[in-house]
Amino acid sequence: MSTQCDRRAAQDARRTLLDSRNQFWKATDIDAPASTAQHLLADLVRQGELRRVRKCLYWRGTKTPLGMAPPSAAALASQLTGQAGIGPAGLSAANALRLSTQIPRQAEYAVPARPPTDTETVRFVNRSARRRRADYELSQTEVAALEVLDGWDRVIETGPQQAMGRLRELISSGGIDAARLAGAGDTEPASARARLRHLLRHTGLAELAEKVPAADPRTEARALAGLAV
């Protein structure tokens, strides 16, 4: 009787898995005995119906002639961190904001906590000191903006004025919440704070700019080089 129940559970679980799209799966998500769930997942990987992302984690996405398409870097980063306030870092941030055409071999993601181990497609960057990103639950676009304001001339391909213009557009269009960005600025590096204050002032948000702690004059002068103050 138990064998029949296990077989029925496996059949039901298989149908559920095959009906899913753009979803991560673990053995614990399957309503079947652990051994049955593990065998089912392994079988579906062999059949090309699932993609093994890492130990104990699988992805059901879109099938292509080359196999199951992998999850996006954003989806994978969110799944592995389970953390608010994550977002693209480095060149990935600049590319996401259309400030660079360069695409790193591994997508870079900043995590405001101890990050998980890297995967084949995603490299995680430790931003545990920048905890306000999580407190204010920044979107990935907002995190990317802070990362660009930090990395700046190391990551942008446009000139500094054009980069600031693009960030102002994102604030004006609602793609970035300026109040959340200002709140999170408290735990950002000094040069990033200087550029953030400049951005907010030149977007007509002087009151928000004053909520961001100022950098020392020398750091501010270096950070704002090439920008009309």
Regions inferred by a protein language model and the residue ranges of each:
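Short beta-edge/loop segments at beta->alpha junctions of small alpha/beta modules
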Residues: 2-82
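Generic structural marker for isolated residues within well-ordered, non-membrane alpha-helices
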Residues: 27, 90, 193
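Short coil/turn segments at secondary-structure boundaries
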Residues: 28-29, 106-108, 161-162
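Short, well-structured alpha-helical interface segments that form or flank functional binding sites
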Residues: 36-39, 88, 140
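Short helix-capping and hinge/turn segments at secondary-structure transitions, especially at repeat
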Residues: 46, 98-102, 150, 154
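Short alpha-helix boundary/capping elements
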Residues: 49, 101, 171-175
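Short gly/ser-rich loop at a beta-strand->alpha-helix junction or flexible surface loop bordering the NTP-binding
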Residues: 52-61, 78-127
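Hydrophobic alpha-helical interaction segments
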Residues: 130-229
